[in-house]
Curated annotation (Swiss-Prot):
The lineage of its organism: Eukaryota, Metazoa, Chordata, Craniata, Vertebrata. InterPro entries: CD80_C2-set, Ig-like_dom, Ig-like_dom_sf, Ig-like_fold, Ig_sub, Ig_sub2, Ig_V-set, Neurexin-like. The keyword Transcription does not apply. This is Cell adhesion molecule 3. Keywords: Cell adhesion, Cell junction, Cell membrane, Disulfide bond, Immunoglobulin domain, Membrane, Repeat, Signal, Transmembrane, Transmembrane helix. Residues 348-394 are cytoplasmic.
Length: 394
């Protein structure tokens, strides 16, 4: 039922399309350009049908820059990139803010056809300058810092960081520069400082579209002065009577603590103890040195007091000389006994192997000496002699 309506709409659309003017193939085509100061702008103009005419580029003051491949304006920053009947491309190097505006590409047909290309020049912000670090902060002070950058177009944005952490709450002001084109941006930040901020890096980062996702920044490390803290360490940790002991007071602060005072609760510091810088030294500990000792560490901002309870233990037991001597003697006796035992074994084996072949001086001196000599001769003569052999023993 709706088919006639749909058909009518389709016919109407076709009729409207038929009434559109045909595409002008001789119309030049250009594109807008955005370039930062100091950069290079590329101006490209193309045409499908040149109709035997040349393309021409003109600047914002309608001065001809190039007509075809012929240079018309003496400006070495402007160079020919490509020239053909269907294209004319030129470049402008070291772009400045005054180069901004509308550039015209023309083709001298009948009628003359033109196309505009808008060149936008970005003002690159300068490296930011940060103030407020002229002197050190004191703990719990409020830091007030300012960051300034000039020459940006459009106006730059500024962010603050403490280490990797972004600081919130900054206030920003934007002022137009004297040239009427660029801007100066100022950012102010305030925050309370603690001793943990001593040495922290504060960064002012400037962001701008001319910086291509990077940022110009300035960083400074802040100094925070604070009262000292301290603790006492014992060396050795388990002191005994007769030891040398060093009680060392390790203090931290800004400025560095430079004054140390040692005291003893309910008494005087022993006369034989020496104060060496931040240390109290006992050269020969005594039981009477036990007690609570106090170290007062000071800098220009204040004093910190820390305590240490000293308990002197009994001297280490020393083994007696007599017990050492007994052990040595016992060891020597054991060695000698072992050697004698070995000697007896060797001697016994020797006697067994030479049984019946011994002749003593006493035997030689007796009445049976000739028989003893004969026994020796028979023994040396082997088994070939008589079976009757005499043996002489002591």
């Amino acid at each position: 039922m709706h088919h006639p309506v749909i058909l009518l709409l389709c016919l109407s659309s076709l009729a409207g399309a038929a009434n559109l003017p045909p595409e002008d193939l001789s119309q030049p085509v250009t594109a807008d350009v955005i370039v930062p100061t100091g950069g290079t702008a590329i101006l490209k103009c193309t045409v499908q049908e040149h109709l035997e005419s040349s393309l021409q580029w003109s600047n914002t003051a309608q001065q001809t820059l190039y007509f075809g491949e012929k240079r018309a304006l003496r400006d070495n920053r402007i160079q020919l990139v490509h020239s053909s009947p269907n294209e004319l491309t030129i470049s402008i190097s070291n772009v400045v803010l005054s180069d901004e505006g509308e550039y015209t590409c023309s083709i001298f047909t009948m009628p003359v056809r033109t196309a505009k290309a808008v060149v936008t020049v970005l003002g690159v912000p300068q490296k930011p300058q940060v103030s407020g670090f002229e002197s050190a902060f004191k703990e719990n002070d409020k830091a007030k810092l300012r960051c300034t950058t000039s020459g940006s177009k459009p106006a730059a944005n500024i962010k603050w960081y403490k280490g990797p952490e972004e600081l919130e709450g900054a206030k920003t002001s934007v002022l137009e520069d004297g040239n009427g084109k660029t801007f100066t941006v100022k950012s102010f930040i305030e925050f309370d400082v603690t001793k943990d901020d001593d040495g922290a890096e504060i960064t002012c980062a400037v962001g701008h579209e001319s910086l291509h996702d990077s940022a110009k920044s300035s960083s400074h490390k802040i100094q925070v002065q604070y009262k000292p803290t301290a603790k006492i360490e014992s060396r050795p940790s388990m002191p005994r009577e007769g030891d040398k002991l060093r009680l060392q007071c390790d203090a931290y602060g800004n400025p560095v603590p430079d004054n140390y005072v040692w005291e003893r609760e309910n008494g005087e510091v022993p006369l034989l103890a020496n104060i060496e810088g931040n240390s109290l030294v006992f050269f020969n500990l005594n039981k009477t040195d036990s007690g609570t000792y106090t170290c007062k560490a000071s800098n220009t901002l204040g004093t910190f007091i820390t305590h240490y309870k000293l308990d002197v233990n009994d001297p280490s037991p020393i083994p007696s000389t007599s017990s050492i001597d007994h052990a040595v003697i016992g060891g020597v006796v054991a060695v000698i006994a072992f050697l004698l035992f070995c000697l007896l074994i060797v001697l016994g084996r020797y006697l067994i192997r030479h049984k019946g072949t011994y002749l003593t001086h006493e035997a030689k001196g007796s009445d049976d000496a000739p028989d003893a000599d004969t026994a020796i001769i028979n023994a040396e003569g082997g088994q070939g002699g008589s079976d009757d052999k005499k043996e002489y023993f002591i």
